[in-house]
Regions:
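A conserved catalytic-core segment of Leloir-type glycosyltransferases
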Residues: 2-58
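Carbohydrate-associated surface elements
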Residues: 146, 168
């Protein structure tokens, strides 16, 4: 993360299963004597996402041993079971951007076969934990009024436990371009994950029609290039590889430059708790379709 000089980063150790494609090499007989690490390895290898659970276990152990160093804990939607113990240790506020049940439902609706549905169910195996934990939290922060409504509905949280604090855009960084840097016919979009919720496939499906009227159109996607997914297959089938570029692992300043170089921004998301991409585009003075 990009941190201010005054902010200390404390890294909680993990196996780093999502930092490598060769996950088999992370296995060793030592894992047999480290139950949490073994659980993490087995869960990932069988298509699950254990991090909300395993992170919670590890961070609780750290906070229990270093309680005196902290005044308040802010959790960014891990919604791990250990939060219920942490809020007994220290004052705790939890941010929920939106209930991930929304992501899961959209994935199930867009699944084309039983394998994809089974895969989505396995990946989202942390949802029962989140549904159990959320109603028991003392204070929740969410990022928009619609998000609050969905948290109440999906997680059965009492309305008076939730405070709406809108996400902020750094308007000293995301500013209109001071120069004429716009490149004609360039569209920009954001896709922080290759999931149906982001709606990227709908924008890609529209590109052939756009190209009929604006043949020099290009699309810049702020996000990782998908591999072996519906979106990647769609790009290949429509022969759009030459006009679509993906940008990931870049700084906020580089993101601002990309907005400045774009003629229009399109945010095709089916659902967002807040929608940073739309806010950033508007702050940069880029015409927006969302």
């Amino acid at each position: 993360p990009e941190l201010h000089d005054s902010v200390q980063l404390i890294q909680i150790p993990s196996l780093g299963m999502f930092e490598t494609e060769d996950r088999m090499k992370l296995f060793s007989l030592k894992l047999l004597f480290r139950p949490l690490d073994l659980y993490e390895w087995i869960t990932v290898m069988t298509g699950g996402f254990p991090e909300p659970y395993t992170y919670g276990k590890r961070v609780y152990k750290y906070l229990k041993n270093n309680k005196k160093d902290f005044d308040i804990i802010l959790d960014n939607q891990s919604l791990c079971g250990s939060l219920l113990k942490i809020q007994d240790l220290l004052p705790l506020a939890v941010t929920i951007h939106h209930p991930i049940t929304k992501d899961h439902k959209l994935e199930m609706q867009n699944a084309s076969n039983w394998k994809e549905r089974l895969s989505s169910m396995r990946w989202h195996n942390f949802l029962p934990m989140q549904k159990r934990v959320a109603p028991k939290l003392n204070k929740i922060i969410c990022v928009s009024a619609p998000s609050k409504e969905d948290i109440v509905k999906e997680f059965l949280v009492e309305d008076n436990k939730i405070e709406v604090i809108l996400n902020g855009i750094d308007i000293n960084r995301f500013v209109p371009s001071p120069s004429d840097s716009v490149k004609a016919n360039r569209i920009i979009t954001t896709a922080s994950a290759d999931i149906p919720l982001k709606g990227l496939k709908y924008l890609i499906q529209a590109l052939p029609e756009i190209l009929k009227s604006f043949p020099k159109t290009t699309l810049t996607v702020i996000g990782k290039a998908p591999s072996n997914s519906e979106v990647s297959k769609l790009i290949s089938n429509l022969d759009l590889k030459e006009i679509i570029s993906f940008k990931s692992g870049i700084s906020e300043n580089e993101i601002v430059d990309l907005y400045h170089a774009s003629e229009i921004a399109v945010i095709p998301s089916l659902y967002e708790g807040f929608g940073f991409g739309a806010g950033e585009a508007m702050a940069c003075g880029v015409p927006l379709i969302s």
